[in-house]
Amino acid sequence: MKVAVLGAAGGIGQALSLLLKTQLPAGSELSLYDVAPVVPGVAVDLSHIPTDVKVAGFGRDDLNGALTGADIVLIPAGMPRKPGMDRADLFNVNAGIIKVLAEGIVASCPKALVGVITNPVNGTVPIVAEVFKKAGTYDAARLFGVTTLDVIRSEAFVAELKGLDVATVKVPVIGGHSGTTILPLLSQVEGATFSDEEVAALTPRIQNAGTEVVEAKAGGGSATLSMGAAAARFCMSLVKGLQGEDVVDYAYVEGNGADAQFFAQPVRLGVNGVSEILPYGELSAFEQKAKEDMLATLKKDIQEGVDFMAS
């Protein structure tokens, strides 16, 4: 099993790489790529951790070396959010970065499972899809926007609010990966009920949790550690799927288009990526209205990615 992390020297990339070094199956390879000159040092640092996962670092000019033979590619590369910015402000900077990296994947490992972490995910995932389409190698089952951070935040906040064991809390989160497009389905949380007031307070807290971190770090970073943990968790779901285990997780994928071309929803994972897109169940009246209200924003975000490639 070879996993490549593109943008491995950044805050998310280093946290993610550390977790993968300790969690990937024995005998795996972890390939770290970044344009920052520190990346070989990150690889050396991680290589001192005694697990049976081989680590190699690749600099700016060796994207092909990092990607060749990769089964899974995770992309946290790009500029992080700063105070006063929302995810959409990042689009103009990160769209170009994602395009270049996607072209590298097409050239070096077109059959890999690709997990896009670079924000704004609503728009960067369509860019990757368009790059693959242009090359004639697009397979929707192999492309994922990683929205796991919304899920783990929801789990943490619900457990805290209700005094539950967080290990038992499961919160479905559908839609997109920014602002109101993030839709936690609190009505479906087993073992907990929420008042209308709690739903009205908790939903925006989950949606704006990224801003909470950016402001708390006072210009010193964004949600790097929790995002690293979320990406590692999603990567391990992909690994289990590749190993033939029956795994269901949430991700932003191209489905049947019932809601939007790309939509975060439950998916069954297998040896070829998505083996089945699952229904997300019945919504409460609050959730139904929230979904209807955000679809125009989500579709606009998706179109922005498509238009970027068309230009």
Swiss-Prot record:
Binding-site residues, substrate: R81, R87, N119, R153
NCBIfam families, alphabetized: MDH_euk_gproteo
Active site, renumbered: H177
One matching Pfam family: Ldh_1_N
Record's protein name: Malate dehydrogenase
Oligomeric form and interacting partners: Homodimer.
Any one GO biological process: tricarboxylic acid cycle
